[in-house]
Amino acid sequence: EFAAQGDPSAESSRAVAAARIFAAAVSARLSEFAERVAEKASLAPDDESLATTAGYLAASKATWQLCSLIFVEPGDGTGIVSEGLEEWFKENASALNLGENGLPERLRALLSEIATISEENGMGNQSGNDTTAPHMNPEDASQYWSCFTSLVALGWTDAAIDLVGLHSCWDEWRMGKERAKPHAELLEAVVALLRCTPRLKLIDESELAEEEQHGDGLGDADEDLSDIFGGLNTHRRRRDGDETSNKFTATSAPQFSAFREAWVRQVQRVIDDNALFDTCGDSELAQGCRAALQTMVGEETAIKRAVGANSNWLELFIASARNKFVSLRVAGDCAALLRKCIASQGKSHHSPELDELIISILEADASAVASAVSKHLDAWFLANVAEML
């Protein structure tokens, strides 16, 4: 039906627009249903059946979105999926059953420990009795710096910046303590570089207009879909709703490469600034910042250390795509990187079924995807993914 409208020569672009709209519609439906069931499960923590259903739906949503990223015009036509993989992982990490060594669980444990430190400090200040107990700061939590470097490696930039924002040096600097100045200056340098990490967002205006035109026509038939077809889930709405989308953003692959090279040079200059590190009296802070910076420029050993020796292969894959293989293509080195990360970390013992699904998708093997879906997901999902593939 799409191909029959207008110029027949535009059949391919219309088919792609239709595929994007279809994928977005199913994704939105899955997201809505998953969120509704997850909310019910949170209100009934003893209901194991409801918790299982919530986990299944979250995994289904993650699987669908990854299929869409790989099979529906990867990289919005560029073929480059590094940034898309990063965003997909950020949104779905908690549904991927990464285990206690995965970043979601490690971050949850860290925040709990920081909350305990804050509570104990508050109780000590109120009592005013125990002057011998050591005062602890957020950065004294056991996984503070390891979580920070993991957040940087996996592209959870806002969370990484929020975490270093808890460091005690900021308050000390504001109070005029000179010893805190070199600590804050080093952290400031890292945060500034994180904020200006280059991005690639290549979406043609004519494609946006066409998607919205077709989408509006489809959306009128069902009021509930008005935010999907031509609405909240269009490329334009997602792009324009992102406050940082036009900052340090390349609009072509060559421009992104140039932006990235210039940015890496800036990061390397900070790494090579020995005075900046030598004046920092906190060795853990200096080591944490250096590890983060080395990860940002794509040093392979730094990336592996940042995600952790016991991390899931998927975390190493995403971190490598973000920091080293920044122009990763489905038709290029994606499968090779996948195999390398699995060889390094091993397959997941927590969810072999989800592993099979994700691996088949990242290998862009449509028949393997269909086979895995038929084994591990329901008939509704299989019917819809068959339409996409």
Pin down the residues of each PLM region.
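Compositionally biased, long intrinsically disordered regions
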Residues: 1-133, 141-153, 158-310, 314
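Extended alpha-helical solenoid scaffold regions that build the rod-like backbones
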Residues: 145, 272-389
